[in-house]
Every structure is written in C-alpha cells, then in structure tokens.
Amino acid sequence: MEAQAHSSTATERKKAENSIGKCPTRTDVSEKAVASSTTSNEDESPGQIYHRERRNAITMQPQSVQGLNKISEEPSTSSDERASLIKKEIHGSLPHLAEPSLPYRGTVFAMDPRNGYMEPHYHPPHLFPAFHPPVPIDARHHEGRYHYDPSPIPPLHVPSALSSSPTYPDLPFIRISPHRNPTAASESPFSPPHPYINPYMDYIRSLHSSPSLSMISAARGLSPTDAPHAGVSPAEYYHQMALLTGQRSPYADILPSAATAGAGAIHMEYLHAMDSTRFPSPRLSARPSRKRTLSISPLSDHSFDLQTMIRTSPNSLVTILNNSRSSSSASGSYGHLSASAISPALSFTYPSAPVSLHMHQQILSRQQSLGSAFGHSPPLIHPAPTFPTQRPIPGIPTVLNPVQVSSGPSESSQSKPTSESAVSSTGDPMHNKRSKIKPDEDLPSPGSRGQQEQPEGTTLVKEEADKDESKQEPEVIYETNCHWEGCTREFDTQDQLVHHINNDHIHGEKKEFVCRWLDCSREQKPFKAQYMLVVHMRRHTGEKPHKCTFEGCTKAYSRLENLKTHLRSHTGEKPYVCEHEGCNKAFSNASDRAKHQNRTHSNEKPYVCKIPGCTKRYTDPSSLRKHVKTVHGPEAHVTKKQRGDMHPRPPPPRDSGSHSQSRSPGRPTQGAFGEQKELSNTTSKREECLQVKTVKAEKPMTSQPSPGGQSSCSSQQSPISNYSNSGLELPLTDGGSVADLSAIDETPIMDSTISTATTALALQARRNPAGTKWMEHIKLERLKQVNGMFPRLNPILPSKAPAVSPLIGNGTQSNNNYSSGGPGTLLPSRSDLSGVDFTVLNTLNRRDSNTSTISSAYLSSRRSSGISPCFSSRRSSEASQAEGRPQNVSVADSYDPISTDASRRSSEASQGDGLPSLLSLTPVQQYRLKAKYAAATGGPPPTPLPHMERLSLKTKMALLGEGRDSGVTLPPVHPPRRCSDGGGHTYRGRHLMPHDALANSVRRASDPVRTVSENMSLARVQRFSSLNSFNPPNLPPSVEKRSLVLQNYTRQESSQPRYFQASPCPPSITENVALEALTMDADANLNDEDLLPDDVVQYLNSQNQTGYGQQLQSGISEDSKVAHEPEDLDLAGLPDSHVGQEYPALEQPCSEGSKTDLPIQWNEVSSGTSDLSSSKLKCGQQRPSAQQPRGFGLYNNMVVHPHNLWKVGTGPAGGYQTLGENSSTYNGPEHFAIHSGDGLGTNGNTFHEQPFKTQQYGSQLNRQPLTSSALDHACGTGIQGSKLKGNSLQENGGLLDFSLSVAPNELAGNTVNGMQTQDQMGQGYIAHQLLSGSMQHQGPSRPGQQVLGQVGATSHINIYQGTESCLPGTQDNSSQPSSMAAIRGYQPCASYGGNRRQAMPRGNLTLQQGQLSDMSQSSRVNSIKMEAQGQSQQLCSTVQNYSGQFYDQTMGFSQQDRKAGSFSLSDANCLLQGNGTENSELLSPGANQVTSTVDSFESHDLEGVQIDFDAIIDDGDHTSLMSGALSPSIIQNLSHSSSRLTTPRASLPFPSLSMGTTNMAIGDMSSLLTSLAEESKFLAVMQ
C-alpha cells in the first residue's frame, strides 16, 4: 500500500500538498495508494497509513497534525473505482479548484471514517467541512454488521462498507463533497468543499426526484463522519453550509440563501432527504409535495422496479437493496439503510441543532439499544433545521437512523426486529400498538371507523396522513373556545382548551363517553371508551399531540396510530403484507393493504359513504375520504370519518356554494330511504356524490350497494329512482366536484379492474373546487337527467321521464333496466348516449361492463380518460358505441339464468343496446323469462308483474300471444346488447350501429374501438321511441333483419309489411317471450313445445333426437330493402360480430315434434347447441378468421365449414330430418357452392364462382360424394357473397351466379346426424337476395319459381317449388327442391334423417320471389348441435321451432299452415328471410360466407322464437345464461352477437356442440328440463 501510495504521481502529491497547505506532517498518499485500499485488506505503512479494507472505503490515518483540517472525504468510488486520494486541507485553506468533472471520483487520504477528517478525529470542524465521502452501504449496514468504531481512537476502524451500493453499484458513492476530481489531473483533487460539483448536484437533483438516495446517502458524503466536531456549534456549521448557497454550487438554488443555518440544514437535509426518496430511510423525502413521503418509493427511479421490490420484499425494499432483510430495523425497511449507512457518529453529544438533536435523542431514547450504540460515537451533526426547512426534512433523524447502524450488531438488534426500524423505534410505542389500525383491517373501513372514533374521520387520518399530507387528519383546526354543550369558555391556547375539555368535560363525565360538542356529527353517540372520546375531541380542538419525530417532518396526528403509520413512510417499513396468496406486496399500513386487496384481489368495496343518500362505495378508506371531502365537502369529510357510525348526521350544511350545492338539496337521500336525512346540503352532497352513480345506482333500492356494487355515488336510493329529479336539467352551475366523479368511479369493479383510486380528477377537484364542482354538477345533472329519464325503482314513469314502460323486475331492479334512452342532456355531445349509458343496470350493484361505464358517471371513471363526458369506465367504450346505437333498456338482470339479478353479464346484457327508450323486454316478458328460468332451475317463481295494465294493448297482445294473426306485432325490441345486441332490436330506420354492423355486440374494453359511420349512429330521436312504438323507423335491411322481430311472430301491423324479418340475430328476449306467448296463443292446444322455451324444447329434442322441424322464416318486408342498408356498408369490414346478423336466415317450418322434441328452452339449442351453425352465425357474423375457411375471403367465397357440416354417420335415427322434412332432391351440381367472387347485385347480382382458397368445399365437394363430412362441407355450403352493396341484388331477384356444385350423391348419400347443414344464412340470404325486398311474403304454398340466377358452372338450379308437405316429424323425400338449400347456398341435403339429399337438377334455381319456400325440417335439436365453431356465421334469425310450429313472420304463414305438411316445394324451400335485405344480407354468414353449418332448422325456428338470452348475457359471458334458459338463438347470438363470440358459446351440453364454456347452471339440462318441462309449460301458460 505504502509503495503504491508513494507511487502516486508527483502532480497529485503537489496538488495534495498545495491544497493541504503543504503541511509537512501530512503524509502523502497517492490516490493509487488509496485505490489499492479497495482491494487491500491490509493495514500498511504502519503508523502513517492505517489502511483497512473497507471495501471501497479506505482511510489512511494521517499523523495527527493540529494544523491540518480534518478532511472529510471518503472515496465514493464505484465498485470498480479505486479509492480516491485522501485529501487534506489546512484548516483555513479553501483552495478553489475547478470543480472536478467527476465529483464522485476523488482521492482519499487517511481520515477518520467517522468524520472524514485527517487528524484529530474530532477536531474543530473546518468552516466548510467537506462532505466526507459517503460511507458505502452494503449488506453489513443492513444487517447491522457494519460497525463504526465508536471510539475516537486514532486507528479508526473504517468499516469496509464502502462497496458501491448494492442497488446502485453504478453509483460510485458520489460524494457531495466538492473535493474530488481525481480525473482532472491538472486540477487539484481537492475541490473547495463549498462548491458542490455541478454534475454531482445535477445528479443529486435528478435523484432527488428519482430514486431515493437513502441507500446511497452514506455514499454521498453524508456518511456519519460528516458530523461537525463537538467544537463546532451547529449554527457555525450550518452557517458554513449556508455559505454554500452563495457559492456557485448547484445547491445555491436549493438552499435558501436567507437562512444560513437553515440552508445548511437544508443542504444536509437535501442530501438526506433525497437519499430517503427512494428508500424510506428515516430521512424524509426532500419532496414536500409528496403526500406520503414515499421514501421507499422508487417510483421515480427509472431503473428501480417498485413492483419487483415489493414482490420480493413484502415488508421493505431493503432486500432489493442488499438482498438482506436480516435486520429489518437496521436495513429494515428502506429507510433503515440510512441507519446502516450512517455512522454512529450521529449521536449528538454536542449541541447539534437542538431540534435535530432533540428529535434524534428522542429517537435514540426510543431505540434503547440504538442510543447506546450512538452514544459513544461522536455526533454526526446533521443540520437540524434551525428553521423549519422548506419541506419537512427527515434530514437529521434520517441520518440518525443510521445510528441504528452505528452499532452494527446492536443495530440489527436495535433496529426493531419489529421491522419498525429506526422510525418505528422512534414511534416505538406506537409501533407496538399500531393499535387501532388493524394491520389487515379495513384500516378502519369507512364504516368500521377505527376504534378510535373513526367516525370522526380521524381514523383514516393515519392513512391519509401518510398518503396525503393534506389529509393527514381532519382539517386543520385550531380551536381555543369550548363549544361543549352548555360551556362557552374561551381559552388563549389550544392546549388550554384541550386541558379544559379533558378535565372538565370528559373526565367530568366518567361514566358517559359522549361528545357534547356543538354540532358534533356524532350526535352524541357514545363512545365505547373514554380514550376514544378524548381522541374524538381532537377533531374539534384540532389537537394533534402525535408529532412525527423525524426532524424536518412537521406532521402531527391526533391519533397515535396515524403517526405510526406515518413513521413508516420514513422508515420504509411495510409490515402489512398482502394476505392474498401469491401476492407479496407489502404496505406500511393496513389501509393500503386493504385497498390493494379490495381493488386487486376482490370486487369488494367495503368503504361506504355514509352521507345520507350517498351510496358510493370504495375499495379503500382513502378513496372514500377523498370522495367525501371532495363531493360532500371537507366538513362532510370530517363527519364522514364517522362512516362507521350511524349515518353521520349530515355535516353542517356547507356553504351552499360548496360541493354539496351540486345536489339539489331537496332531493331525497336515496341512500337511506328511511333515513333520508334530507339536509339539503347533505342531499346535495349526495347528489354530488354523483348522481351519475345513480346511473350505476347500485340497486336503487339498496341504499348501500354491496361493496361490489357500483360505488355509485348516487344516493343510496339511486337518484334515478327519483324520476322527478331534475330530469334532464343539467345545471352546470352547481358545484359538483369532479373529484367526486373520479371517486365515484374510483371504486373500480374488479372486473376491470382495477381500479384506479380516485381519479386525478378527484385530486384536481381538491385543487380546483370550482372546477370540480362544475364537473360534479354536470355529473349530477346527468344523473338527474338519467334519473329523470328513467324511473329507477319507480315502476311508474314520472311524467317527465321519457315514456318508457317501466320494467318491473321480479324483484330485479327493473328500474335499473331502464336505460335512459333520451339523450342525456348531460352529455349532449353524446346525444346518442343510449339508455345504456344510463342503464339502470347499475342497479345490479356491480359495475358491469356496461354499467361501469355508466357508473363512471361518464365523467368519473378512473379508466375513462379524465372526465370523458360519457363513460369513464372501460365499458365506456361500450357506452360510446352504445351511444350511437339504440339502447336496449332491457332489464339489466332481466334474465340471467345463472344469476338472475346479479350477473354482471346479465346486467350488461339487459343493459344491452335496446332501443334507446325501449326496454328490450316488457315486464311481462321479463316475468316470463324469469318464470321460465325459475321453472328450469327450480327457483321460486318471479314476482307477478304489477303493471301489466300499463302495457299497451298491442304489447299485451303480442306478449300474451293473443293471436299470431292478430296483426299485432311487438315492436322490434332491441335485443340486449348481444347479437340480439345488434341492430336486431333497432328500429328499422336505424342505421347499423357499429356494434351492429361491426361487432354485433358492444365493444368490450379490450376490443378496439370501432369507428362508427355516421349513418350508423342512431338518430337521437330514435332513441326516444317508446316501447309502444310499434312502427319503428325503417332499419337498413340488414338491421331490420337483425332487429329482433318476433321471428315466428310475424304480424304486419299495417299494410306495410313488417320489417320484422326473421332477423339474422336471434330474437331478443322480448321476442322470445312474445313468440312464446304467441305460440301458446296460436296453438289452441298448447304443446309442451309451446310452453317450453326453445332451448328446452330443442334440448329435449336433442335428447330424444326426435326430428323437430324448424321453420324457415322468410320475412321480407318491402320495407326491408337493400336500400335500407347503407350501401357503403362494408360487410367485409365487419368484425366477427356478424354484420350478417342482419341477414335473416330462412326458417324452415318445423313439424311439431313431441315434447321431447321441444328445444331446450327456446334458445337453448342456440345458446348451448350447435345453433352455432352458420345459421347461428346468421347474424352475419363471420367466423373468427380462424374458424372461417380461408376460402371465404371476407365475402369472397361461400364455404361450407366442415364444422358446420353434419357429423357423418348420424342418421335419421337422430330424428333429424334432412333439409326440409321432406327430403328434397338435389339434382343440380354436385355441390352447391356459391362462390361470391363478386358482390351480389353490385355486379349484376351474380355470385361469381371462385374456388375456395382455404377449403374448396364447393369445387372439391363437387367431385366428392357427399360423405357426411362431405355433407358437412357440401351441405350448408353458404353463399359467400362479396360484400353486398345495398343495391347489389336486384330486388327482383337478379340472377345470382351461383356456382352450385353439389355432388348429388353427396347430398343424397349422406345424412348427417340429423343435423342439417343448411346454412340458413346462405339460404336466407340468397333467397333474400332473390327476393330482396321484392319478394313478397306469400303463403308458404306458393309454387312460383324464381330464377335465382344462373348457377355459375352448374346449370341453374331450379328450385322446384313443388308443394312440400312439411309434416311434423315427417321425413319425406318429397321432392323438395333444395331450393332452400340453394337459396341458402346450402346444398340441399336430403333429409338427414336417413334420407339422402337427392341431387336437384342444376336447372335454374327458381324461386318465385313472392314465394318463400318454407322448408320444414324436423331436424332434431340434437342435430342442431352444430359445430358452432364450424359455422362461419350464424344467421341471427334462424328458423326457430316454436311449439313445433313454424311461423313465417315475413311470410305471415300461420303455424297451422306450415303444419299443413304439404307446402309447395317452394314452400318447402327454405324461406328466404329478409329477402328485402341487401345482398350483403344474403351473405349473412359472413356476408360473403355462407358457411354451411348444420342448420338446425328447428333451432332456426326456435331462434325466431328464441329468447335472446345472448343479448341478456354480456359479451362472452353467455354461459352464465346458459343455465337453463338458453335458447338456441342465444347460442347463435353468442356466436354472432358477441364480437367475442366468434364461436357461439354454448353452455348447453349438446353433444355436437363444442362449446368451451359450459354453463354451471345448466348442469344436466336434459334431466332438469325434463323434470321442469311441465313446470315450464305451466309458467309459460301463466305468462
């Protein structure tokens, strides 16, 4: 070492000598010599150089020279750097050297590691004691092994801790000390101490905001050795430090030049504070703005991964720092690093800053062992702020923590194993108690307020204090006058008041712990213990006896537990570890942990706003407090603290101008109905809570929605319930705080999850109350509007509300069902905000996807961008989409098989996009659905509907099925959002909504937002259409088709043909209900089929495998012309949700099947079964690309998807009938594959045959005998037209150039499992195209032939429209032209029931336009189990078997007619539905794709009747609906309605249906349904 030391360059020596003042006694030590010390463990140059390896720190013991100043500098070298030369300075000399470019590189001279000075270890400090090089921190510090030699003996034991910080190996211990510039050879290594090197300062500054330097603080020259010598007075020292401000050093701007001592303190503090920034060493973060000194928070540190830290170390980040938590107290939590880093020198034996010393001593006293550890070591004078530093500076104490470290071993022990660490030690007693705040407990949940009068709100203080300094505790109050009841004494000081209260009042009433303070929100509710009252009184007096002991930190708390929590912010201790398995996050307080757990691991929102009428719930108390404070006002916030208490009496009315004003004072507090403490301000506050929440209104009825409920701020009784509430008024003037909005949404449903705590808005709200008020006011207004729009609970719509028939849920919150259809004036911009936006769905108490958007109150959703006027939550995206589309106001929970009322999905579904003001379901329908569900599940029957009388006669008729022929048609209710969801329930005039055309389902948050074409948005006016409006505006044909028309319930209300064409989309629940009723009505002899839901029937059929004919519905209304559909609509562009939904699929008339044949609840097959076939897809949804044969480009080719194909080998035994009950012969091309190279109609309405690229089913099938697989391919080959323009097909049925190639033998040769592969879509569409609006609904028996077009390669297939008897269960091979198939683009597969399809002549397919061939097929439900996946698309309207009767809505065929067994073949031919629809509709499957999926015609028929559970079900969560009420249509809906559902989800256990999801509720549907069949029937009858 010595040799190396002497080997230093002459220049360095000279520099050293010069800077030292050339003191002869100074030992020359070369930098290198020192550098070697890093590697050397030896003490060399005995006498002169005491060199002890201390990893990076080498100090050479200078010969004591009085003349020499102690040079405080330790090499802060990076791990790879060598120790710098030790610098000496003569006491008086301050050589001004150029600032070293590398401040952290410096030379190290022998020095006392504790003070860094060369000579007397505790020599009077130099005026500008250079900051000694930081003592490196390493595991030893953390583990308490790092040990400073407490004695001042010359041979200081330099702890060998100078290794670079484990966490910051890259940071050479950057010394703050200005002295160093080893790199600048020309420059003296000794920089004047005062000039802090700019680079270094810059670095520090960056660190200040970024990673805490606490770990590094020691390395920074903050090492314990910095302490001035005892001889130096703190003031002098500070003064010296302060001088720095005058220096050019970067600190100049940091340190207040005004206060020298302060400056010095700040300087030190700055250093330490910054250090603490990252690791919560006791040092307080320099950052004053931080609500909670997240000293531990590495958030700012780019390189530091807080998550990782937390994950790796439940209690602290220290482990990350040194991989050791051995002494959590020592290294303990982040902050404990400081202890390790700081030398014992910290003990203030001398008059260091009194404050810091005092604090420190307190800490030491608390840290009993620590005190001893420090006691002997020379004090490190951390500049105690002589004046309050600009920000609380944990500074000295922070540094003091190192004291713990000081006694290495003792430190470990010292640092409380409790992991409280120094800070905890400071708050040791507190630490032990932490009493009130249960580590895990909700941290007194708002309701639970901590033992200590949480009600006061102080309970949360601790949490707040840490998090939000402003919130530390109740508003700062400094009361000097006694307002105790009957006492008016006044005092000069708060202390006197407190003393008075405690002695005269509290103790005077020993037996009674009641706060009698005037206006106390406790309302004299007694406390359980005196101490609680004492603590409570602090709220009134403002007393905060518990002060943070960290120097520079001025925080004080009225509750000790809050202080303890706060202290953790300094120490970084995180004793509260997430209890969730596998989650290692640790928190400093139970509150944070509870928040984390509630938000991250559950949907629970235990913190309920207790303000009367406010139903907001939060996952964490802080959010609740924030809500209360921002929305209800600071006073409310304080009172709110009472949250645990009985509803606190409304806080004294705040200024009317205050936040509360946003609420209309008069509004009843909806939260506690009985309790409505209508204090106007309280009410207003509640309103402020965000009536928006009302929108979400948990259940308006429920005053406090379950934690999972929308944390709707709206009064517990959702404001909406008060229809009368300001209606649409949107007084922006009210001061609602926006913050509240965020708060409202703040409690995110776990679903999303996540929820950000109160949004920034809330924060801003605090900052800008006026703005927040405005926002809040807007929110409230919107809510009011929404409320006004829809009676929440009030079954009777308030007069001012838009006329919406009240949904009377059986107990469901029907009112929620109402979506405000009216444009919320609130969001005028969102004129289209559908009821969905306001959907009462929220009443479900859960933020369902849709609801959440609403619950966000548009503005508040955390997720939502800022205050997006519409919906904040992720669902807002849905809402946004929804805005354009008619809202389905269906009952949120109207029908959720699994959870009738609760399911989020159901709520969403119910929320579905119904018509803006129309409920998808009438109460009756709801009732019926519920009844069915109850029957299926064995649950209690729903509550009778009280307001049937409210229904219009027509509606009643429709619902009751007073006569299919009555001519009464239910308005096409918009299905809940699902496929049904799509335009299905829209008015005909409405353009496709984006979700309709594009996704067919509301876009989920995860789904990219789809732009909506202008024409797609529903005119606002439409939104207001009342449920009673039976003549909805014309929808684009596609939409019309999609619109849920009672598919089997076709009544043309007026001469105008109903546009109720069997929509490709499955019927909505309403339709299903109506159909069900109609079916019963239509059939005098109600069959079980009639009574049972389609799903049930189909299920039964599938179980029995008895053929259950499906009815082809071809409802083509003149109105539904292609023209209606936006011609520019690019179906190809449509997402998986099928645009094709628009396209109705032909329904085949089904002969009645035995009860067993009945579908399992109408929709069941569709929901659970392979309804999935293209017919399922019929909504026009294209298969997911994966599913779709590539052969179908979008719309390019019709391809029969193999999965659509029927299973081979299934014979008629399955009871499946071939296409049409009567086998239809197909004489034409071997395969009927329609290749739509060209859009129909657009190019002459011809499909151009194109080879399938992916699977050339058509071409190859042509050659292939139809094996069942072939049938699978060939049959049901759908026509895929290129996207069809509205005009593409000529209504007169321009020639479609179908490339029909079906191997006759294939067709005839194989019967699929009774599953018909017909692609309804293809059928419906082709026929539709042919009929394309021109086709008139004509009796099924019409024999006219219509030339569909020339078959491309093949001769035209003439669809012979011979009459075909569709006998129930009849499986004739009657020559039924596979016109249906042809039309559908399916190869007509002869009856699958064992009958081979007979090849039809390729002659021109002719189908008389006016005439839809009604092909009855008694394919069994089992057969229906088509591969949903296989289906490229499901037609939204598939033929549905209803009661074994087929109704051709469009045709207007009566069931009896169809039953008549003999229809002309044309009748037998699949009816083209929605022929009027655009060509694109023809392509319903994927518009282009006609995938032949096994069309269970019965499913189609059923589908017409089917309840659109899918709509009810939220996207993707269809399975829940599957429980028993699933209807095939649902499955279909699933497939097409939900964008998610590229493949229909079938929960039902249909054998062929490969549904990944099975509905738990469904269980064994067959047995259940069988047992419940009668009950269902009964219920249906009752309905």
Curated annotation (Swiss-Prot):
Record PTM text: Phosphorylated by DYRK2 (in vitro). Phosphorylated on multiple sites by protein kinase A (PKA) and phosphorylation by PKA primes further phosphorylation by CK1 and GSK3. Phosphorylation is essential for its proteolytic processing.
Q: Where is this region: Mediates interaction with DZIP1?
A: 745-845
Residues where Omega-N-methylarginine occurs?
Answer: 175
Main localization of the protein described in the UniProt heading: nucleus
Do you know which InterPro entries this protein is assigned to?
GLI-like, Znf-C2H2_ZIC1-5/GLI1-3-like, Znf_C2H2_sf, Znf_C2H2_type
Return the annotated region ranges for Disordered. 1-78, 368-475, 620-728, 809-828, 863-918, 1164-1189
* Modification N-acetylmethionine occurs at: 1
Q: Where is the composition biased (Polar residues)?
A: 1-10, 58-78, 448-457, 810-820
Renumbered to this chain, the Basic and acidic residues biased-composition regions fall at 461-474, 632-648, 684-699
Q: Where in the cell is it found?
A: Nucleus; Cytoplasm; Cell projection, Cilium
Cross-link Glycyl lysine isopeptide (Lys-Gly) (interchain with G-Cter in ubiquitin) maps to 773, 779, 784, 800
Q: Glycyl lysine isopeptide (Lys-Gly) (interchain with G-Cter in SUMO2) crosslink: positions? A: 438, 462, 779
Q: Which GO terms describe its biological process?
A: alpha-beta T cell differentiation; anatomical structure formation involved in morphogenesis; anterior semicircular canal development; anterior/posterior pattern specification; apoptotic process; artery development; axon guidance; brain development
Q: Which residues form a coiled coil?
A: none
| Any one GO cellular component localisation term in the record | cilium
- Zinc fingers (C2H2-type) by residue: 480-505, 513-540, 546-570, 576-601, 607-632
Spell out the PANTHER family in the cross-references.
TRANSCRIPTIONAL ACTIVATOR CUBITUS INTERRUPTUS, TRANSCRIPTIONAL ACTIVATOR GLI3
What does the subunit comment say? The phosphorylated form interacts with BTRC. The full-length GLI3 form (GLI3FL) interacts with SUFU and this interaction regulates the formation of either repressor or activator forms of GLI3. Its association with SUFU is regulated by Hh signaling and dissociation of the SUFU-GLI3 interaction requires the presence of the ciliary motor KIF3A. Interacts with KIF7. The activator form of GLI3 (GLI3A) but not the repressor form (GLI3R) can interact with TRPS1. Interacts with ZIC1. Interacts with ZIC3 (via C2H2-type domains 3, 4 and 5); the interaction enhances its transcriptional activity.
Pathological association: Several mutations result in developmental defects of cranofacial and limb structures. In particular the add (anterior digit-pattern deformity) and pdn (polydactyly Nagoya) alleles.
Q: What does this protein do?
A: Has a dual function as a transcriptional activator and a repressor of the sonic hedgehog (Shh) pathway, and plays a role in limb development. The full-length GLI3 form (GLI3FL) after phosphorylation and nuclear translocation, acts as an activator (GLI3A) while GLI3R, its C-terminally truncated form, acts as a repressor. A proper balance between the GLI3 activator and the repressor GLI3R, rather than the repressor gradient itself or the activator/repressor ratio gradient, specifies limb digit number and identity.
Protein name from the UniProt record: Transcriptional activator GLI3
Gene symbol? Gli3
